[in-house]
Amino acid sequence: MAKCDKSLEAIDLDRAYTAPRKAKWAENKRINGLDTETSDGDIFCISVCWEGEKPMVQHNDREKLTSKQVWQVLTDHKARSSLNMWYNLDFDANVVLNHVCSEEQLAELVVSGTTLANSDRTYRQYMDTDKELRKGEYLITYIQSKFLEIKDHNSHIYTHYDASQFFYTSLENAVTEWLGESKANDGLEAGLFGSQTPNQLRETVAESDCVTWTNLSLTYNVSKGDKWTIHNAKSYISKNWSDILKYAQIDAELVRDLWQEAVNVGEELDIPMGRPFSTGYLAESYLDNRLREKPGLGPMPMAKMAWESYAGGRFEVLKRGNVGRVAGPDINSAYPAVLAELPDPKTLRWKRAKHASISEIETADYGFMTVKVSTDPTREIQPFAVKDEKQDKLVYPSPQNTEITVVKDIFIHAYNQGYVTDYEVIDCWLGYKTEGTTFPFDFIPELYDNRKTAEANGLEKRGLLLKIVLNSMYGKTCQTTPKRRELAESTELELHESYVPDMSLPKMIREKYSEGFIESLTAGAWFNPFLASYITGLTRLELHKQICKHDLEENTVMLATDCVMIEEKPFEESNFVENLVQDGLGYWDMEYKGDAFVLGAGVYQIDFDTCQKGCKDNCNKFSHKHKVKTRGFSEADLEKGLVNAAEKANGHIEIESTRPQTISEIIWSNEELSQVGNFLEQERKIKPEMDTKRKWSENTDFKKLLSTCETSLPLKI
């Protein structure tokens, strides 16, 4: 098995067989903006801007809000069946839920995604056999990073969404880009609403041996002559109360106006904006509205083989360290380009060919094969994705008599290019186009052209929403969602379900689920193994094909989804550059050229010769002349770049980050719920030997990598 550890039999496919849903438009829905202001995880005010009204604030005169006050805002009649938008709902939802729910309710919410809450925080189980809500009770559904939904005893629905995921930037930047306004804070520092660590505090204190900060009952020892800064959050809030209320109202109003503009732009483009759960759901809604019928899964044995062959995008580093001058060509909208040309698998003619010949496989239009294969271990870039069970990682090794399942196009390429030294076909499903074969996604080129036209004409908002739809379609074809339910006495497990015993659970969850619970994996509505495997498989294949075609295997530094990094001189001397087209769906384009320092997959720095933002020659902004990628880390944590951090590193690069703690992580790690919403300082490390997907020299350090380029060999499996 490649990318997914669950076989197709272990996935509930019911939703994949449903018809497209009716589009939900926003044109007749009220749009409201909301925001919380917190201190040490406690909510001291909620601001709300109802559509057509001036913003208001629910507060308790500088004190923590009561649960009743929170419920009043969340379930106001103006929030019913409305688009209630927040900016970074994850934070707000966590502090809100921790405010209004008991431990038992939160444990149930973390496990199942739903719980029954009420104004007095007492617990009553919501049974399948008794679904009637009582007055004062609310059925809560919360899916992290997606939405918070509340249902009351009158069956009124109040759904809250996260606007931030659609803008890819801060509220301040989004407001500037979309509304042409600035987000004025009147000198307020939101970070001061909560507790601060000593080096973040603001009021200078006199020299002393010891300072006691009574707000947290913490004592900090200070050496004589040092000056520390301290700050009492409660005091700061009290002194700046009127400004904070104004700040909160402005945020709520801006969020409302921001989403109103997004709705106006999106629905002009025929993108249904009425249920903005996520960027993926936006793409799903677009497909639901555009296509009358979903592509089918095709014959189930073929679909199982397709799922076995699915391996996602390719991230692999072949050279690391100071690799010198590089060129980085990439494919324009690679995944949408492949999807545009794929058929509905149920409209193909399929046949099983257990021991098919190479010629039979090659002449088929589509197909998947299980094969026992060996490849030439001296070749730098191997063609097949294999799960390394020891590392629990997807790697591209030199398989030796290894059984794999693969898209037939990838195997034929490897065979024709001389990679395959021995093979035995074990099973094969081959597909052929017929007169009735349909291509449901043939509208994608038009959508891509519309996006490019919008961007060229300065209509960046239209371009962004079209880009979201285009780039999010692929994810729907491989979407699976975990589901959990309580174990009942007479429960019989379905094939796609598994039992999670109580002894493996943390304390709060074990108290609620004393017998454990049942877990399953559910396919998304547009789940389709044929499409998922072919989209990613043909994209990986295109990278490899171009490298082989232009004899650049020994000069390739890195492969990353839809892009390759190649040593500049060999690249320029090849014919690859002739393939480059500035625009065009699925065509190659030049993303960058410059000096590269590479540590691992998605962790590198490119130094450009000139400013990439069109600034004057004296541009001194680091981000304009350098590209820093730190996959799995935040680029903001390396303001001066990866090279600078490596030069100062003592064995490893330390990256400190600060983020709010969530209910889920608190419960799963057996910590105190009082920590929810508090900001946790974390330290992560980037090590010089971070890449383990290939065979490297055993001893390396940053000093070596900064001065030399190291090469690698593929693993053997």
Curated annotation (Swiss-Prot):
Q: Would I find Ribosomal protein among this entry's keywords?
A: no
**Transferase found in the keyword field:** yes
Q: Name one Pfam family in it.
A: DNA_pol_B_2
What are the cysteine partners in each disulfide bond? Answer: none
Annotated TM spans: none
Catalysed reaction equations from the record? DNA(n) + a 2'-deoxyribonucleoside 5'-triphosphate = DNA(n+1) + diphosphate
Enzyme nomenclature, EC number = 2.7.7.7
Gene Ontology process terms (BP) = DNA replication; viral DNA genome replication
What does the UniProt keyword field contain? DNA replication, DNA-binding, DNA-directed DNA polymerase, Nucleotidyltransferase, Transferase, Viral DNA replication
Q: Which InterPro entries match?
A: DNA-dir_DNA_pol_B_mt/vir, DNA/RNA_pol_sf
Q: Which GO terms describe its molecular function?
A: DNA binding; DNA-directed DNA polymerase activity; nucleotide binding
Class in the EC hierarchy, top level:
transferase
Q: What does this protein do?
A: Replicates viral genomic DNA.
Q: What family does this belong to?
A: Belongs to the DNA polymerase type-B family.
Q: What is this protein called?
A: DNA polymerase
Q: Which organism is it from?
A: His1 virus (isolate Australia/Victoria)
